[in-house]
Amino acid sequence: DAGHQRKGNSAKEPIGPGASQTKPKVASGTHGNASGLNEYELTLQVSLKLRDELQARGYQVYMIRETHDVNISNAERAQMAANQGADILVRIHANGSDNTSVAGALTMAPSNSNPYLGKSVISASQTLSRKIVDCFCAATGAKNQGVMQTDTMSGINWSSIPVSIVEMGYMTNRTEDLNMASTSYQTKMVQGIANGIDAYYGA
């Protein structure tokens, strides 16, 4: 799932099945001041390369989006993946911070007390997230910020299959932003994510 889309959708949806708390269906995402890229552009660039790499490794890949002009909520993205019979959902994103010196990669997974997901999905999501962030940082040299456990992400809470949100780096950090926009670094990121998926499956 290449995170975001050209136009955000501020209409609200429950953060999980049966939840009273709501969030915008799709945030507009962050922006690279140095690269000039929008997050939705970067995530699709990387996701298309990741698709090709995973297919070359023998995986079947289902893309949530392959263009910018879509309107798919985070809950819908999670449900689409499961409805396609996917085994895992990998959500490609980039980070942002008010502090421009902050840099590094992290993944997001549900906590053990997530009220929307079963224990097996929670455990597998945490494992998938750990494998991806470790392999990603090994491939790229990015600072490893580890696995952030969160139960406020609609795109996690609506997933009936193991899921990880990959925050590849900070578009608000000049060096990391320019790295992520470069073809050579994108290749390293893709290799790292694919290596993490391989590691998850024990390949």
Language model features by range: what are they?
Residues 1-203:
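Catalytic-site microenvironment of enzymes
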